[in-house]
Design a protein with these regions (language model features):
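Short acidic, glycine/serine/threonine-rich loops at helix termini
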Residues: 74-79, 118-121, 206, 214-216, ...
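C-terminal catalytic domains of large/alpha subunits in multi-subunit enzymes
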Residues: 67-68, 222-227, 257-263, 292, ...
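Extended active-site and interfacial segments that coordinate phosphate-rich ligands
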Residues: 11-15, 120-131, 208, 215, ...
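Glycine-rich loop/linker segments at domain edges
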Residues: 6, 12-18, 80-83, 87, ...
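Phosphate/diphosphate-binding loops
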Residues: 110, 261-307, 518-542
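Short Pro/Gly-enriched beta-strand edge/turn motifs at strand-loop
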Residues: 77-79, 168-182, 265-272, 426-435, ...
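Flexible, low-hydrophobicity surface segments
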Residues: 1-150, 175
Length: 731
């Protein structure tokens, strides 16, 4: 196959910068009506009554729905329990309030202004109940995950005898870390346009999972999935919050059917904080044992993670912490804490970000306790074999990431003594390093290619364009394979009319779509009687067949998956495999080096530069891959120094649910981000040699920054985000 390392801009770059790129709800069908929600103002209890009189008096109001018969709108089921929704609970079907901000009425009107005004006029009386919204609340209920969800994927992680090895270790670290609730805050709000074309429901939405919407809303409404079409041309940021069926789509479909008009709903920013998933709060205890040289002998990793009352959102923190180093004695356990919130969910590097923050901070403490260089201790504890299964890694170039990153960063210039490096103005300077890993998962896919006599080729495959550049990666693969111009390639993703759609998340989008397209290209060459490789004259090849167009289709599954797993794909269910495969284990890796500057009088932390070197297999699209890493670093800066969703312990919900009050990094916070890649293909995972990148890009950033803050100040901060007042208290 032709190398894919030459640079090329995004295929959708021009459309994005000129405003021509169409997102989910950027359409206005004839007769479009607008919807808005009225929401609960208590955190738990029952609705006694809802007063809609004032809402009905607003000119233009067409519908006010406060209750839908459960037979008309069923639960979609929880995505992590074999269902389709981000949570199993479906609002508007009973009088129970499970969390603050839960919808209690859906208003549909001729204009957005009328719908919004009517929603604000709806009042309700409640019967409130005591609530728990934090890990330590008296009414929160804690369950052991391996007992509550007795399937291997969510079992305790055990290798060797970690307790005995830790007790015998001459150097020990025993520390606790706290991760906050956080929200995704994508630029594009959660929104939908739904309309009925006869008996067919058409949904336009920016989503990461068109297949779940298609099959999930069909289940809810009791219709065949073939009568539901979902189109998601582009997504204005997802990051995990848009990876499932949202609870508003079913009610919206019913409203559109009753009204006989298309209906559009755009959640407000505060509603995205209360009606969609979020990163749950967590508490981690990490115990590391080492010998005097810094060789890691034992690790014990115990986690408490927030979940909702109605669903158990499973935790996978120890999947990565058990495999980041060659620690033969490891014990990991996750516990879930039921609270009165909507169900939390996946947010970029959902478990790995905070898990590695804890582990890599503890490793840094071991380095200082043993007098070892933080880079050297990581290199010394590297491994080529998975310590959990004993299987080899399909590829692991984390040592190369560390060596290359250290050279690019200038790590040799670091004075190891904390508080020893200062700028001429007295600003404290700190250097920090951390590595990260993310499981190399993959899913089944069906790719359809159509080559025409005009020399163009269209591709339809499972995937969603959320800005990560999947269209560009697919275009590059096809153009390079056939030796044609990228402009001759048209790519369709996110459209259930064109191909079955699987969830795009967990960095398996590229590792799923590209192998399927690669297989379809092999089928196309065979059909056209062409050699396995080399440039193709599509016009001549197609014309020779006597048809104006040649269509081919290829189905691929992840290594070790049975062929019938494709049935799960067609049903819109999650069907991933990994990181354990027959004969090998796969992860992506990264090394981050961070410089921080801490102002000694104010405690303000700045991050003037970060160097990140990634091992993601073959780099499918250098331009978009580098953007993915830069974006992950920006996310890491925000998670470390800015982002926290403040909970209201009295009434439930989140207090800072707007972009004004939920601080994310702005341009002035972000400086130099130097990105590099190992760019070594991983042929065991798939024939294209690609591994995931979008998630691992964030993993380890917080630890690198936190370790740099320690180097600058001499103080460890084990609670994220690190606030100015925390730093000031120790300067």
């Amino acid at each position: 196959m032709t190398p894919m390392s030459t640079a090329q801009q995004r295929v959708d770059a021009n459309a994005k910068v000129t405003g021509m790129q169409r997102y989910g709800t950027e359409r206005a069908p004839d007769g479009l009506a607008f919807a808005a929600f009225a929401v609960a103002t208590i955190g738990k209890g029952r609705v006694i009554s809802v007063d809609t009189d004032a809402a009905w008096k607003v000119p233009g109001v067409q519908q006010v729905m406060t209750h839908i018969d459960p037979d008309e709108l069923r639960s979609p089921g929880f995505i992590m329990g074999g269902g389709y929704g981000f949570q199993s609970r479906q609002p508007l079907v009973d009088d129970h309030i499970a969390y603050r901000g839960q919808p209690i009425a859906l208003i549909v009107a001729d204009t957005l202004l009328a719908a919004t005004e009517a929603a604000e006029l709806i009042t309700a009386t409640y019967e409130p109940e005591p609530l728990a919204v934090t890990l330590d609340a008296p009414d929160a209920e804690t369950v052991v995950q391996s007992d509550a969800i007795p399937i291997p994927m969510f079992a305790d992680t055990v290798a060797g005898d970690a307790d005995a090895a830790f007790a015998a270790a001459p150097v020990q670290v025993d520390v606790e870390f706290h991760g906050p609730t956080q929200h995704h805050v994508p630029m594009e709000l959660i929104s939908s346009v739904v309309e009925w074309h006869g008996d067919t429901l058409v949904v336009h939405e920016g989503t990461q999972n068109s297949g779940a919407i298609q099959n999930g809303v069909a289940l809810q409404l009791g219709i065949d999935p073939s009568r539901v079409e979902v189109i998601s041309e582009s997504v204005g940021g997802g990051f995990g919050q848009k990876n499932s069926l949202q609870p508003h789509i079913g009610p919206l479909a019913i409203a559109a059917r009753r009204l006989g008009r298309a209906v559009k709903l755009v959640l407000t920013r505060p509603q995205t904080f209360h009606q969609a998933s979020f990163r749950p709060a967590s508490r981690q205890r990490v115990r590391l044992g080492a010998d005097a040289s810094g060789r890691l002998l034992a690790a014990i990793h115990e986690v408490d993670q927030q979940t909702s009352r109605h669903d158990l959102f499973p935790a996978l923190y120890t999947e990565v912490s058990s495999r980041l180093y060659g620690i033969g004695d490891f014990r990991g356990r996750e516990r879930l804490v039921r609270t009165d919130t909507q169900t939390p969910g996946f947010m970029r590097a959902p478990f790995e970000h905070i898990s590695v923050y804890a582990l890599e901070s503890a490793v840094d403490e071991i380095a200082y306790a043993t007098g070892q260089d933080p880079v050297a201790i990581r290199l010394a504890n590297d491994t080529t074999q998975d310590p959990v299964t004993g299987l080899p890694f399909s590829s692991r170039h984390v040592a190369e990431c560390l060596r290359r990153g250290a050279e690019r960063f200038g790590w040799a210039d670091r004075n190891p003594e904390p508080r020893s490096m200062r700028a001429p103005d007295g600003t404290l300077i700190g250097y920090g390093v951390a590595i990260g890993a993310y499981p190399g998962d993959a899913a089944p896919a069906i790719a359809k290619l159509s080559a025409d006599a005009g020399g163009t080729i269209s591709v339809a495959v499972a995937g969603h364009e959320m800005g990560q550049g999947i269209r560009t990666a697919i275009t590059r693969l096809v153009a390079n394979d056939l030796g044609i111009e990228p402009a001759a390639v048209e790519v369709s993703v996110g459209d259930t009319r064109r191909a079955p759609q699987h969830l795009t998340a967990g960095s398996w989008g590229t590792t799923t779509a590209l192998p399927a397209v690669h297989a379809a290209l092999r089928e196309l060459r065979s059909r056209l009687g062409l050699p396995e490789t080399g440039a193709v004259d599509l016009h001549a090849a197609v014309t020779t067949t006597g048809s104006p167009r040649v269509d081919v289709e290829a189905t691929t599954v992840a290594p070790g998956q049975p062929a019938d797993v494709v049935d799960q794909l067609r049903k819109g269910l999650v069907a991933i495999a990994g990181p354990e495969y027959p004969g090998f284990v796969t992860f992506s890796y990264i090394a981050h080096f961070a410089e921080v500057r801490v102002e000694p009088t104010t405690g303000r932390i700045r991050v003037p530069r970060v160097v990140s070197v990634a091992d993601c297999g073959r780099v499918a699209s250098p331009v978009t891959a580098a953007s993915q890493v830069r974006g992950g670093v920006v996310w890491g800066v925000g998670a470390t120094l800015r982002e926290q969703s403040r909970v209201d312990t009295r009434y439930g919900g989140f207090l800072n649910s707007t972009m004004e009050e939920y601080p994310i990094p702005v341009n002035a916070d972000i400086h130099q981000i130097d990105v590099d890649f190992v760019d070594e293909p991983d042929p065991l995972l798939n024939p294209v040699g690609v591994k995931g990148l979008g998630e691992v890009a964030m993993v380890g950033v917080s630890a690198a920054i936190g370790n740099a803050v320690f180097h600058a100040t001499g103080t460890r901060f084990r609670r994220l985000p690190i606030h100015i007042e925390d730093v000031l208290a120790h300067l």
